[in-house]
Structure formats: C-alpha cells, structure tokens
A protein has these predicted regions:
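Juxtamembrane and boundary regions of transmembrane helices in multi-pass small-molecule transporters
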Residues: 2, 134-176, 270-305
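Structural signal for alpha-helical transmembrane segments and their membrane-water exit/capping regions
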Residues: 5-24, 47-57, 160-164, 207-218, ...
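Core transmembrane alpha-helical segments of multi-pass membrane transporters/permeases
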Residues: 7-9, 31, 35-55, 184-212
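Membrane-interface helix termini and inter-helical loops of multi-pass transporters
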Residues: 22-33, 138, 219-220
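Alpha-helical transmembrane segments in multi-pass membrane proteins
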Residues: 42, 46, 50, 67, ...
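Alpha-helical membrane segments and immediately flanking helix-loop junctions
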Residues: 73-137, 226-275
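Transmembrane helical segments that form the transport core of multi-pass membrane transport proteins
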Residues: 185, 189-257
Length: 305
C-alpha cells in the first residue's frame, strides 16, 4: 500500500512538472532560494561544529558542567544536555540529527536518545520570533508566551518519560580522548553539506507540491490549511495574507509550527535513517504535542487578544 501511494505521488508530481513546467520551475527556484538564503547559512555552521564536537570528544568537556544543573529538572546525560541545547536553541532538524549521530557513535543510551528525539526536534526560537511573529503575523510582545506554549508541552513530556526511565538503563561510558584532527574536520564538513543538501532537496520538492496544491479547485480555507500541513514557511505566509482575525491566525500559526509540516517529518526521517529511532512513534508524539499547543494557543488568544 505504501509503495503504491509513493508511486502514485511520484506520477502526479511528474505530470504536474510536465504540464506546468514554468510554475514547477518557479516553485523549485523559490524553494532553493529559501534554502540558500535562510537554511544553509543558519544550520550549516552548527551542523559542522556539532559533528566536530561529537567525534573529537570535546562535547563531554563542554557539557559536563551543565549536566548537574539540568538534572535538577530533567535527568539527562551530558550527551542529552547537548541534544537538548542544540534542539531547542538551533531548532529543527539539529535535535534529530544529533540524536542519530550520538546513537550511531554509541555515545548515548537508545532509550534516552528515543525520548530526546521526540521532544527536541522543534522550530528554532529565532524563526518563531522573527519570521512567524514579526514578519508574518506582525505581533510584538508575544515571543515569550509563544515559546512557552510551543516548548513547555515537549519539556514536560520529556521530564515525565525520562523520570520513568530506569536508572540501570543509563549508558555506562568510558572517558573519551579529546582531540581535533583535520580528518575529523573534513568528515564533519562533508557530513554537514550532505545533511543540508538533503534538506534542500526536500524543501524544493515540497515547494513544487505546494504549487501543485494551489491549482486544485478547493475552497481557500482548505487550501491554506493544506499548505500548512505540507510546509509551514509557505503555509504561514499564505495564512498571514488572509483577512481572518488575528486570533485565528495566531492559533493556526502556532499549531502549524508545533506540527512542523510533512516536509519537516520527511526531513526528520532522512536524519535518523539507519538508526533504531521510530518515526511512527515520533509522529504520534508530534500529533499529541501539536494538540497541546493548539489548546494552549486557544487559551492565550482568549485572554490576550
């Protein structure tokens, strides 16, 4: 069934490119420009630095002092601290990428990696504050509460799951030697570019798919919701240009941001390929956290707008 659906989707996408080549090329260009101007310069440096830290052994030195403070509210290892910081500060898909990298290197227990994988693959606070709130919704003074309703459900779920994790399941580590060589740096650069090129490919494909969806004879509200389900950057832009109330725009924008779009799920799947991390469970948790954010956004809109 899955293979048939994928084959059908490929045929539809190919037919659209052949029938509407100008629109498809324009959508592809827009997607690649978004990747080149926004995603590549933001994520590539950190992708390279993350790989260097993980494979050189310096990550332990960086996180050992932070671990004791994190354990007051979340029982994580030093590697878990690194995943939490990278996932929440630098945003999607660094959380899932670092979970996969540490798991492949056998530097984190699979159970801890699985839990952190569920909760750290979020949209970055910079994107939320600058693009969504200021550029699109033109809302000032909403950054703090927006971060709260997007991140707190994930953090609470993470605390509950990590506290349930049995102590004996913790990974026993031996001290790793810290060294940085040109071989490690070269490998980190190649890994970073491979990761970002893969992300760029998904952004391009989903940009073409959104262009296809816009030609469907569907009511405008349905089209806007569908675009947000597919990819949030273009989806939230379309949402912001409607004449809907600011309450409705805010609720839907926060809900779409929590979900991350099918494009985000596809990119996440490519990051964790070859590991034991379950995409099925990830999607279920993502839907649950999206529902929590939706309810919190409704409550916020009632009291603040």
């Amino acid at each position: 069934m899955k293979k048939k659906f994928i084959c059908f989707a490929i045929l539809i996408l190919t037919a659209y490119i052949l029938l509407y080549p100008a629109d498809a090329v324009n959508a592809s260009r827009n997607g690649l420009m978004l990747w080149y101007e926004k995603v590549l310069p933001t994520l590539l440096p950190f992708a390279i630095i993350s790989n260097v830290l993980i494979h050189s052994g310096y990550m332990d030195a960086l996180t050992k002092h932070l671990t004791k403070y994190f354990r007051f509210f979340m029982p994580v290892s030093g590697e878990g601290v690194f995943i939490l910081c990278s996932g929440f500060l630098f945003g999607f898909p660094m959380g899932s990428k670092n979970c996969a990298e540490l798991l492949k290197a056998n530097k984190i227990h699979p159970k801890e990696a699985e839990i952190l994988f569920y909760i750290t693959n979020n949209i970055s606070p910079v994107f939320i504050g600058s693009y969504i709130l200021l550029q699109q919704l033109q809302l000032t003074g909403m950054f703090g509460i927006s971060i709260f309703i997007l991140y707190v459900p994930a953090l609470i779920l993470g605390m509950l799951l990590l506290y349930r994790k049995k102590e004996e399941n913790r990974q026993k580590k031996t001290a790793s030697q810290s060294q940085i060589t040109f071989k490690i740096i070269d490998a980190a650069i190649m890994n970073g570019f491979e990761t970002l090129v893969r992300i760029g490919g998904y952004i391009m494909l989903f940009s073409i798919l959104i262009s296809l969806v816009e030609k469907l004879p569907l009511p405008k509200p349905v089209l806007i919701l569908l675009e947000n389900v597919l990819e949030i950057t273009n989806g939230i832009n379309c949402l912001a240009n409607t004449d809907w109330s600011i309450q409705t725009k805010y609720i839907l924008a926060m809900t779409a941001t929590a979900f991350g779009g099918l494009s985000g799920i596809a990119q996440t799947s490519s990051m964790v390929k070859g590991t034991s991390l379950s995409m099925k469970k990830y999607c279920l948790v993502k839907l649950f956290l999206t529902l929590c954010t939706f309810l919190l956004a409704v409550a916020v809109s009632v009291f603040l707008f």
